[in-house]
Design a protein with these regions (language model features):
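Structural/interface elements that position substrates and couple domains in central-metabolism enzymes
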Residues: 2-426
């Protein structure tokens, strides 16, 4: 698009062809938002099986149910061929930004996507980096990689994803940060996203958008750590931590409620807080609170295990008590086990002599939970009164809405509810 007016006209007429690189938990909902706004969307992914599943309308993210809707829209096409992206006017990059074994950002997915797009995109195409990255990544790493591949002409912007899996919140209703490396890129991404998102928020630089996203998740990390530490205190005082939180939440200012739990999980919160701590270290700034929060998160599963055995001892339990874990996914109603607390709690329970089984109605049939020796633990498919009553302790790690919690509350011999799922169920 040669002029701002021609780009704006193409947006209004929905004549732009949009691409999405990476069809996972960020890219697929974004593709859905694009198609709902009326744009034709080409979705690219390295995983050919994922592409084939989407082409057939089969869900690859059970908590979204997007595949059939995308297929029925008639405006979405998945592909495994990067050359197809040549036809796109705008491409959103939604590749993973994991940490490597040393806790440092693994830049390989970013570099690979930049090299690929440099090879195939038409002149003056717009790239919108949606992946969560440290400040300076868009300008230094991504733009310099494009230039190194002979494509300084490509426009580049950053608009960090704000996906909240399982929350039921419309992606397009969440305010959308955005910034371009140039005025032209900034104007284009704002013009485009004004036709898709309810509240596009243009900020002064890509670095501001990058830092804001890391701070958002670091804020959650620190406050969840505080909630978990406070729940430990309440446990020692024999106080219901959620009753205390209910009381505190009546204050209309200066308080935001964060729930305690068995530990943090998922892709974002642990990683993004670590990324921000890494940035602090690089610039010589302290990150004491972030580092302490990380330690609290690391210790939390062990605290849950100790509480389990304390409860069992108090009941005069067997040498090998039977424990049923309900909810292995990292959060409510989400089919994801990445960094889930259950992955470390179950092995510790089995190492301590417990006979551990598990139930999770959200996870697919291929899901596995292992003991301390790496052996798959038995899965319980049906959670009824007979099943629940067969265990010395029911440990609640995820409060899925499809579980009949009244059955658990009524028929369990003993429970450790880390999510508040059993409150007011009896």
């Amino acid at each position: 698009m040669n002029t701002p007016s021609s780009f704006a006209a193409a947006c209004q007429a929905r004549h732009l062809r949009l691409g999405v690189v990476g069809l996972g938990g960020v890219g697929l909902p974004l593709a859905d938002a694009y198609t709902r706004a009326g744009y034709a969307v080409l979705g690219y992914d390295l995983d050919i099986q994922r592409v084939q599943a989407l082409a057939a309308g089969r869900d690859v993210l059970r908590y979204h149910d997007l595949a059939a809707r995308l297929l029925q829209s008639g405006r979405f096409e998945p592909t495994h061929d990067p050359e197809r992206l040549r036809a796109c006017d705008v491409v959103a990059v939604c590749v993973p930004t994991p940490l490597d074994m040393s806790g440092v950002l693994d830049t390989r997915p970013l570099l690979a996507s930049a090299a690929m797009l440099a090879r195939v995109l038409a002149p003056q195409a717009l790239i919108v980096l949606e992946s969560t990255v440290p400040p300076g990544t868009t300008r230094k790493l991504y733009a310099e990689t494009l230039a190194a591949h002979g494509r300084p002409d490509l426009l580049l912007a950053h608009s960090p994803e704000r996906e909240d899996p399982g929350a039921g919140r419309s992606l397009t209703s969440v305010p959308k940060l955005l910034a371009g490396l140039t005025d032209e890129a900034s104007e284009q991404v704002h013009t485009l996203y004004s036709t898709i998102f309810t509240t596009p928020v243009r900020v002064a630089s890509c670095e501001i958008a990058e830092a804001a996203k890391l701070y958002e998740n670091a804020y959650r990390s620190v406050n969840i750590a505080l909630a978990n530490e406070f729940s430990n205190i309440c446990a020692r005082l024999e106080l219901d931590v959620r009753a205390v939180l209910d009381a505190a939440a009546t204050k209309p200012f200066g308080f935001q409620r964060f729930e305690p739990g068995p530990g943090v999980g998922g892709h974002c919160i642990p990683k993004d807080a670590r990324l921000l701590a890494n940035v602090a270290r690089e610039v010589g700034a302290p990150a004491t609170m972030l580092e302490q929060a990380a330690r609290i998160h690391a210790e939390r599963p062990r605290f849950v295990v100790e509480e389990c055995f304390r409860l069992l001892r108090a009941r005069g339990g067997a040498v090998h008590p039977r424990v049923l874990i309900v909810g292995v996914a990292y959060k409510r109603d989400v089919d994801v086990t990445t960094n889930a607390p259950a992955l470390s709690i179950a092995p510790e329970l089995s190492l301590g002599g417990a006979v551990v089984h598990w139930h999770d109605p959200v996870l697919g049939p291929d899901a596995i939970l292992c003991d301390h020796a790496g052996r798959a633990l038995p899965r319980v498919e049906v959670l009824d009164r007979t099943t629940v009553a067969a265990y010395d302790l029911v440990l609640v790690l995820a409060d899925h809405s499809s579980v009949d919690w009244a059955v658990v509350a009524t028929h369990a011999r003993a429970t450790l509810d880390t999510r508040g799922a059993l409150r007011n169920r009896i």
